[in-house]
């Protein structure tokens, strides 16, 4: 099985390094995938999910569809097909396990799910939570800034962002209404902060709480520094 996971890792490294991934590779490179694998394994172990090898495979493959789509919103469904075909060819999992991986990849970037039933979370919930954790904390901040570097830094009259304090539910409503989630970098950060509300496992919420608190402190400090300089006539 170790060799099979190495084969999966090699495929993902090669695929995400392909030029067709384009600018999405700034925040969705193999480093991101590896961090998601780390979080997914940590969540799965804490939440008593029975198959850590399956978790590792799903995490490694979750963004593979990015190399095959123009519309990023389709990368989950396209990636599920690619992952399923590769795993069947590899022959390392039973078909019912591969279906679980396909479902998790297909759903990992879908709208938020309702809270799961009591008991161990399914693979989809683990993968979604792990992917969300990589939006939070200092790593999430760097990913957000790097991926949205062409945007203005912040709104002039509200440095911490127009979306400051937005909830996960409100964010989902904005997306469903076709409204932009970020027109400035600070609102990209607010978008990522709001994603914390969509974490479903107790483990992920415990891990994410201090990370998202730090992001809020960062925005408050940014606003304080900018306002001080504005009052002094330096900006």
Kindly label every feature range from the protein language model.
Residues 11-14, 58, 100-108, 148:
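Short acidic/histidine-centered micro-motifs embedded in hydrophobic/aromatic stretches
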Residues 49-60, 95-104, 122-126:
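Alpha-helical scaffolds flanking conserved acidic
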Residues 3, 7-11, 97-100, 104, ...:
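Exposed alpha-helical structural elements
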Residues 1-78, 88:
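Acidic/His-rich, divalent-metal-binding segments that scaffold phosphate/diphosphate chemistry
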Residues 63-64, 107-111:
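A short structural micro-motif
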Residues 78-84, 90-107, 115-121:
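Helix-adjacent hinge/juxtasegments
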Residues 12, 40-43, 83, 105, ...:
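Hydrophobic alpha-helical packing residues
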Residues 22-48, 61, 112-235:
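Divalent metal-dependent phosphate-bond-processing catalytic cores, especially two-metal-ion Mg2+/Mn2+ enzymes
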């Amino acid at each position: 099985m170790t060799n099979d996971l190495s084969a999966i890792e090699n495929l993902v490294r090669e695929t995400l390094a392909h030029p067709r991934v384009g600018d999405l590779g700034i925040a969705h490179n193999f480093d991101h995938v590896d961090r998601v694998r780390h979080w997914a394994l940590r969540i799965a172990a804490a939440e008593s999910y029975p198959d850590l090898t399956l978790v590792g495979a799903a995490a490694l493959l979750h963004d593979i569809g990015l190399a095959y789509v123009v519309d990023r919103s389709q990368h989950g469904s396209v990636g599920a097909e690619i992952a399923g075909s590769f795993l069947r060819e590899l022959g390392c999992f039973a078909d019912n396990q591969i279906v679980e991986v396909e479902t998790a990849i297909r759903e990992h970037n879908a709208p938020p799910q309702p809270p799961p039933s009591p008991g161990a979370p399914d693979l989809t919930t683990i993968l979604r939570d792990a992917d969300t954790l990589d939006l939070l904390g200092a790593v999430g901040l760097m990913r957000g800034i790097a991926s949205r570097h062409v945007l203005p830094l912040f709104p002039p009259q509200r440095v911490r962002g127009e979306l400051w304090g937005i909830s996960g539910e409100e964010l989902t409503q904005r997306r469903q209404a076709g409204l932009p989630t970020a027109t400035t970098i600070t609102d990209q950060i607010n978008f990522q902060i709001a994603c914390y509300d969509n974490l479903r496992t107790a483990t992920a919420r415990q891990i994410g709480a201090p990370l998202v608190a730090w992001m809020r402190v960062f925005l408050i400090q940014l606003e304080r520094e900018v306002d001080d300089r504005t009052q002094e006539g330096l900006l």
